[in-house]
From Swiss-Prot:
Bacitracin is thought to be involved in the inhibition of peptidoglycan synthesis by sequestering undecaprenyl diphosphate, thereby reducing the pool of lipid carrier available. The lineage of its organism: Bacteria, Pseudomonadati, Pseudomonadota, Betaproteobacteria, Burkholderiales. It is an enzyme of class 3 (hydrolase). It catalyses: di-trans,octa-cis-undecaprenyl diphosphate + H2O = di-trans,octa-cis-undecaprenyl phosphate + phosphate + H(+). Belongs to the UppP family. This is Undecaprenyl-diphosphatase 1. It comes from Burkholderia lata (strain ATCC 17760 / DSM 23089 / LMG 22485 / NCIMB 9086 / R18194 / 383). GO terms for molecular function: undecaprenyl-diphosphatase activity.
Length: 276
């Protein structure tokens, strides 16, 4: 196996793990990093989706007891059934729109320049949302994921649709959207984690079936390396983020998004790199 390819797979895995659950867009970072590393062949998008599987396994491990409790409680506990229903409701809008517009989105938006614009716009939205949160005088309406209603879940699910635009961020859309709809910051963050499970599992399965030719003996090793790197880095990131949101807002991520997006645009339009 080519050592250069191994290094690229590990780098992209770490990028995925560190950015999947932060409001900075993992897909956007993978597109930019893949272009910079010249890791953008016909199977690159499949690689990007498959290594997300490693990142979501980190969430499953972190919440393994909660997930086991929900699954075992489905036959007898109303709260487990209600929570599962909320996850399903919040997942449907993004899946429906994703299946409808997948080809057009990948053809038009899966390149660094559109990602850069989305990063800047998303950063501005986060700044606006955080300013609005500071002006609120009443406490959040929903203080636990168990208090979510189906309508709350639907609203967060609609917000998640913005993440179909690379660079907007799935976690950013769901967390900021949830906060605007009255969810406590930690509740919005945790619900965003749970929403990632069906979305990423589904995307991984879909890409695996659709592009099964990408899974050769050589590429399978790269996929595994990338997924392992994503798992380890995502596990560290998830634990850190849960502590961070207890006492901080997302303003720093907004400014990072804007700065990174402007940097990508500057690099592209100055001719330093050709963002193909």
């Amino acid at each position: 196996m080519d050592w250069i390819l191994i290094c690229k797979a590990l780098i992209l895995g770490v990028v995925e793990g560190l950015t999947e659950f932060l409001p900075v867009s993992s897909t956007g970072h993978l597109i930019v990093a893949g272009s910079f590393l010249n890791f953008n062949d016909s199977h690159a998008k499949t690689f990007d989706v498959v290594i997300q599987f490693g990142a979501i396994l980190a969430v499953c491990w972190e919440y393994r007891q909660r997930i086991a409790s929900i699954v075992s409680g489905l036959p007898s506990r109303p709260d487990a059934r209600r929570f599962t229903l909320n996850v399903v409701i919040a997942t449907i809008p993004a899946i429906a729109l994703g299946l409808l517009f997948e080809k057009k989105i990948k053809a038009v938006l899966f390149s660094p320049v559109p990602v850069a614009f989305a990063l800047v716009v998303g950063g501005a939205i986060i700044l606006w949302a955080e300013a609005r949160q500071r002006e609120r005088r009443e406490p959040p309406r929903v203080m636990s994921v168990d208090e979510l209603t189906p309508l709350d879940a639907l609203k967060v699910g609609i917000a998640q649709c913005f993440a179909l635009i690379p660079g907007m961020s799935r976690s950013g859309s769901t967390i900021i959207g949830g906060m605007l709809f009255g969810l406590d910051r930690r509740v919005a963050t945790e619900f965003s984690f749970f929403l990632a499970i069906p979305i990423i599992f589904g995307a991984t399965l879909y890409e695996t079936v659709k592009d099964w030719q990408a899974f050769t003996v050589d590429s399978l090793g790269l996929f595994v390396l990338g997924a392992v790197a994503a798992f380890v880095s995502a596990f560290v990131c998830v634990r850190w983020l849960l502590r961070y949101v207890a006492s901080h807002d997302f303003t720093v991520f907004a400014w990072y998004r804007i700065a990174f997006g402007l940097f990508v645009l500057l690099v592209g339009y100055s001719g330093w790199l050709n963002w193909a």
